[in-house]
Amino acid sequence: MYVAMIIRKYFLIIALLVMPWLAIPSVSAADKGWFNTFTDNVAETWRQPEYYDLYVPAITWHARFAYDKEKTDRYNERPWGVGFGQSRWDDKGNWHGLYMMAFKDSFNKWEPIGGYGWEKTWRPLEDDNFRLGLGFTAGVTARDNWNYIPIPVLLPLASIGYGPATFQMTYIPGSYNNGNVYFAWMRFQF
């Protein structure tokens, strides 16, 4: 009964998340398709990691143009927490990672998140240790103010890194007084 109520309440959101998956055209046998590529990359990152990662949440920032001041004055923007993961670099130099992280959210309540991240990586300098990345993360989170119901997430990723240290970030889109949050963390590879 409770699950049915949630599905009815969030039908539009669920439909918008599922519709793009249904609209993907079929692919030829020679091309394994985006979904098989995705699942192969997740599996390879799970089975053959090159690194183990420590995630340290650094900042959340609520876009001031999208919030009432009295709300932002109450929100936590120091997301204390920690996370762990494993990652690898593919033959094109792109980053793949699996991670679990828990941090204090805007209401200073614990929020877990876990998933897969991918970034196309550029090394614009002669020093290959310096890199920039753009990509996405697909995962699941849960929040206190939503009764810790698992919520799927598909968010953009961007990063700047040098050697084993990377400053990685995302933006959670939203409406007025909801979402519109910049979230960033440090990732250290071991």
UniProtKB/Swiss-Prot annotation:
Keywords: Acyltransferase, Cell outer membrane, Membrane, Signal, Transferase
Site entry (Role in the phospholipid gating), positions: 176
Example of a GO biological process term: lipid A biosynthetic process
Catalytic machinery residues: 62, 105-106
Molecular function terms from GO: acyltransferase activity
Subcellular location: Cell outer membrane
GO cellular component, one term: cell outer membrane
Record keyword Chloroplast present: no
Family: Belongs to the lipid A palmitoyltransferase family.
This protein's name: Lipid A acyltransferase PagP
Annotated source species: Salmonella typhi
